[in-house]
Amino acid sequence: MSKQRIYEYAKELNLKSKEIIDELKSMNIEVSNHMQALEDDQIKALDKKFKKEQKNDNKQSTQNNHQKSNNQNQNKGQQKDNKKNQQQNNKGNKGNKKNNRNNKKNNKNNKPQNQPAAPKEIPSKVTYQEGITVGEFADKLNVESSEIIKKLFLLGIVANINQSLNQETIELIADDYGVEVEEEVVINEEDLSIYFEDEKDDPEAIERPAVVTIMGHVDHGKTTLLDSIRHTKVTAGEAGGITQHIGAYQIENDGKKITFLDTPGHAAFTTMRARGAQVTDITILVVAADDGVMPQTIEAINHAKEAEVPIIVAVNKIDKPTSNPDRVMQELTEYGLIPEDWGGETIFVPLSALSGDGIDDLLEMIGLVAEVQELKANPKNRAVGTVIEAELDKSRGPSASLLVQNGTLNVGDAIVVGNTYGRIRAMVNDLGQRIKMAGPSTPVEITGINDVPQAGDRFVVFSDEKQARRIGESRHEASIVQQRQESKNVSLDNLFEQMKQGEMKDLNVIIKGDVQGSVEALAASLMKIDVEGVNVRIIHTAVGAINESDVTLANASNGIIIGFNVRPDSGAKRAAEAENVDMRLHRVIYNVIEEIESAMKGLLDPEFEEQVIGQAEVRQTFKVSKVGTIAGCYVTEGKITRNAGVRIIRDGIVQYEGELDTLKRFKDDAKEVAKGYECGITIENYNDLKEGDVIEAFEMVEIKR
């Protein structure tokens, strides 16, 4: 147990440290300052002195207060006496005033002692959000920020009170205090996908109609099949038949409803999936019995498989003399669609959309597949779903066809649809009837939104119109920012596409190199490239590192930058990222020519892309026999990793490119060294390192095309 210091003892008794020091000196005890530790016998001697005095002071204060009370009562009784008595009373009062002054003085000395606040207990569990700072984490642990900073320093992390902590560091500190930590998941209310949940586990969920999409090759009978189902199952007497085209419709078969999406082919299907909309439960693949598998048939199979949607094959046109259903089955087995009769799991239904034969069998199979899938939704929830179609009507304004996927949609609901918002003014079903509510898997057309959304956008109903407006406006602003950030500049990756669209006549190129001879040779070689439809135009050449003005010129002229044996400086890197300017860095002229020529011919398909992960500045060099040159470095950007490739840059010009030999922190090998730390580096097969050189670390990252 640590000994008590003089200032701590004084604080405990609400006294000044000087009083304790004086008393100790009177006891012939040598005292240097208030930080001196007290021995047990010294504390006992001080306790006798000061605690006894405090008891006496408290006792005297109580007596004086009692006397004051008696004097006040006596004064009240004597007010009825004569003048003489009053004068005597006045004399007495003078005495009382004196006593009162003494009492006040005593009371002043005997104020309640300001005991130090008890330290807050460290909680057993704390929650934190990503990006929590040292100060915020210290508050949650009920400790001083300086304590956390000390612990971080011992872990080799130099931090201040406003520094953000990562998950690993937070867990290490919490473990040191014996505290359990849990990261809070911050829900972004603008992300509409969080409102879409699987309703199978909801106890209040009930069965919902299946949503079916019909796909297939051109002229194989998709539209005819849709019309046949529609006319078979929907009577013309229902509100004048189908009077409203909203991109979907519902039919009833054996007391169960089925929703069909009347989408224009695979493009819309793909667009919806690209926007995250998974609306289809079952895919009907229409294949003509007299034609077999065609390119769009394969495309449809791939779409359905990627979406993990069950496929029912409708073999159409069986009434034709040239039909051969067995050939269709045989061809489809090559794509993993094996009929049940042949030991597979795919349902095949032969039918004729023109005559109506087999339509009932198809609907029955749809019902069976839907039953196996256990499609459920909770109609008591607020509605969520997907946009099927949208348009701007001259008389009604923006309108959207929606498919309700869960919950119930009502007229008057506050709604966010994609990047638009509003309150539903009117709602029309697939029969053209005005309705007030629509349950799960029901297609409806609504009006009342402020703008036209896109097909595949999601919609969510909110209880508060202000909230819907705020989220809708915020999503709209975010989409504008995203559109502005999207690349409009030419790059070698999109060059061929722009050439095909007739947008590119000249490819503007800026060349920066290490020496003038290389720059001139490269410019001459590029000018010789001859590809029909586009010309190479050199708009600027210079010697030296790529700088910010080069990026500005490339952005203004819609050009690309080629660096030959040079690197961009930090300002140029930031500007290129902000303006989406394409920079290509090479060390071999042939590679430059080949890359640009391939891009112009539409053959460019790079699999890997270089990613710079960090930079270190050489502060000092040491020559060691049998080892070579060791560079004492300071990491200025990112991090240096043991397995990264490196290049040595001197005055913006690449001197050498190779690999790290060793990476050390003090005497220990390190896997990586982060920004702000010093390290020792040796380069494999390279010893010509000098102070001021920049070591750039990079790695090759596989990119998707």
UniProtKB/Swiss-Prot annotation:
Q: Where is this region: G3?
A: 262-265
Show the segment(s) annotated as G5: 352-354
Q: Which CDD domains match?
A: IF2_eIF5B, IF2_mtIF2_II, mtIF2_IVc
Q: Where is the composition biased (Low complexity)?
A: 59-77
- The segment annotated Disordered runs over 40-124
User: Keyword annotations for this protein?
Assistant: Cytoplasm, GTP-binding, Initiation factor, Nucleotide-binding, Protein biosynthesis
Where is the region G4?
Answer: 316-319
What range(s) does the tr-type G domain occupy?
A: 207-376
Give the location in the cell. Answer: Cytoplasm
Q: Where does GTP bind?
A: 216-223, 262-266, 316-319
One example GO MF annotation: translation initiation factor activity
Q: Where is this region: G1?
A: 216-223
Question: Where do the record's region annotations for G2 lie?
Answer: 241-245
Record's compositionally biased regions (Basic residues): 94-108
Main subcellular localisation: cytoplasm
UniProt biased composition (Basic and acidic residues): 41-58
Q: Per its UniProt entry, which superkingdom is the organism in? A: Bacteria
What's an example GO cellular component term for this entry? Answer: cytosol
Q: Which family does it belong to?
A: Belongs to the TRAFAC class translation factor GTPase superfamily. Classic translation factor GTPase family. IF-2 subfamily.
Role noted for this protein:
One of the essential components for the initiation of protein synthesis. Protects formylmethionyl-tRNA from spontaneous hydrolysis and promotes its binding to the 30S ribosomal subunits. Also involved in the hydrolysis of GTP during the formation of the 70S ribosomal complex.
Give the protein name, as stated in the record.
Translation initiation factor IF-2
Natural source organism? Staphylococcus aureus (strain MSSA476)
Q: What is the lineage of its organism?
A: Bacteria, Bacillati, Bacillota, Bacilli, Bacillales
Q: What's the gene?
A: infB
